[in-house]
Regions:
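ASCE RecA-like P-loop NTPase motor cores
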Residues: 1-333
Length: 333
C-alpha cells in the first residue's frame, strides 16, 4: 500500500544520507591525517591514502620522493665506508640512476663480470613487434606463446605478470590446455607456493611482483621465465608521479630518466630468477613486442645479461641437447 511504500522510500533515503555522511567523515579524517603526516616545511615529501582491497580500512602513507638528503645525513655522513652491492644495481653499464636516486655524489664503482656463461646457458625470446600489452587482444595473442614456451620446456616455469588482472586473464585462456601442475599466486602463502614449486616436477607458477626478486630455484626445476610486459612503474603510483614531475620541472624527461632505468632494473631482477648456477640453462621469454618495435626497446634489452637471442622457440632444442636432457615425467593428479 501507499503508506508502506512511503516508509520504504524514507528508510532508503535515510540509508543513503547516512552513507554520504560516512563518506564525508572519512574524507575529512583523511584530509586531517594527510595535513598532519607532512610537515609544512617538507616539500619533498608526498602523502596519499590507500584503501584495503578486501575491507573498508584506509591507510595514510607519507614518504620522501627524493631520499638523497636523508641518506647523506643519516648514513653516508656518519659512516666511514658504505658498500652497496647487488646483481641489479646498475642499469646497463652505468650506476647513474642509482647514484641519483640515493644522492651518492662520490663513490668508487665496480661492475664485476658474471660467473655465468649466459650466451651458452640462456636463450632470450622476444615476441613479435606487433604484440603490445596495451592492445585489447593482448592476452588472446600472448596465451598461445605462453603455451608453446611451457610445452618446449616441459613446464618448469615462472610466468610473471605486472598485474593480477592480466595474470588471471591469461590463466583463464589456458584453462584445460596445460598438462602441467599449475598454481596461481594467492592460492597459497608465498613460502608454501615456493615449496610446492620446488617439490613438484614440471610445475608452473603464475605470479606477480613478489616473485620477480629474492627467489632462488637452482637446476632444471626452473627452466623457463616468461615475462608479460616491460615492467615500467605505474604512473598512477603517487611516488612515481612525484618523481616524474620533479624531473620534468627541471627540464628532464621523466620517461627517459626514471621510467626506462626503473624498467631495466626490474627486468634484470626477473631475468635473474633463471640462471642461478653454472649448470643451469633455460629460456627467458618477453611477451612485449615493444622491446622490438620501440626505440627505447633496444636500450632496455641491451642492458640484460647477454643471453643468445632466438626468433623461433624451436631453437631451444639445441640448448636441451647440449645439456643433460630434461625429465619429462608429469605426475598424475
Amino acid at each position: 500500500n501507499e503508506a508502506e511504500s512511503e516508509r520504504r522510500r524514507d528508510l532508503a533515503l535515510r540509508a543513503v544520507t547516512a552513507h554520504i555522511a560516512t563518506v564525508d567523515r572519512i574524507e575529512s579524517a583523511a584530509r586531517q591525517a594527510l595535513s598532519g603526516a607532512v610537515p609544512a616545511d617538507e616539500r619533498d615529501t608526498i602523502a596519499w591514502v590507500e584503501r584495503g582491497d578486501r575491507d573498508a580500512r584506509y591507510e595514510v602513507n607519507a614518504a620522501p620522493f627524493e631520499v638523497g638528503d636523508f641518506l647523506r645525513a643519516a648514513l653516508f655522513a656518519r659512516t666511514p665506508s658504505v658498500v652497496l652491492t647487488s646483481a641489479t644495481l646498475a642499469e646497463g653499464r652505468s650506476f647513474a640512476f642509482l647514484r641519483e636516486s640515493l644522492g651518492v655524489e662520490a663513490a668508487q664503482e665496480l661492475i664485476a663480470p658474471s660467473p655465468f656463461d649466459y650466451r651458452r646457458q640462456a636463450r632470450l625470446f622476444i615476441a613479435p613487434g606487433n604484440l603490445n600489452p596495451k592492445d585489447r587482444d593482448f592476452a588472446q595473442k600472448a596465451a598461445p606463446i605462453v603455451e608453446e614456451c611451457l610445452d618446449r620446456t616441459s613446464g618448469r616455469a615462472f610466468v610473471l605478470f605486472t598485474s593480477y588482472a592480466r595474470l588471471r586473464e591469461v590463466r583463464a585462456l589456458l584453462a584445460g590446455r596445460l598438462t602441467f601442475p599449475t598454481k596461481l599466486q594467492g592460492e597459497l602463502p608465498r613460502a608454501a607456493l615456493l615449496d610446492w614449486f620446488r617439490a613438484t616436477p614440471n610445475a608452473v607458477l603464475f605470479g606477480t611482483g613478489t616473485f620477480w626478486e629474492g627467489i632462488d630455484v637452482v637446476g632444471d626445476q626452473l627452466s623457463c621465465v616468461i615475462i608479460d610486459r616491460l615492467p615500467f612503474p605505474s604512473p598512477a603510483d603517487p611516488l612515481v608521479a612525484a618523481r616524474i614531475a620533479a624531473l620534468e620541472a627541471r627540464g628532464r624527461s621523466g620517461f627517459e630518466h626514471y621510467m626506462i632505468p626503473s624498467a631495466i632494473v626490474r627486468l634484470k631482477q626477473g631475468f635473474g630468477r633463471l640462471i642461478r648456477s653454472k649448470s643451469d640453462r633455460g629460456l627467458i621469454a618477453l611477451l612485449d613486442g615493444r622491446a622490438l618495435s620501440m626505440r627505447y626497446g633496444a636500450t632496455i634489452v641491451d642492458a640484460l645479461p647477454p643471453a643468445t637471442r632466438i626468433a623461433d622457440l624451436s631453437a631451444l632444442d639445441a640448448l636441451w641437447a647440449e645439456f643433460a636432457p630434461l625429465r619429462t615425467s608429469i605426475p598424475k593428479d
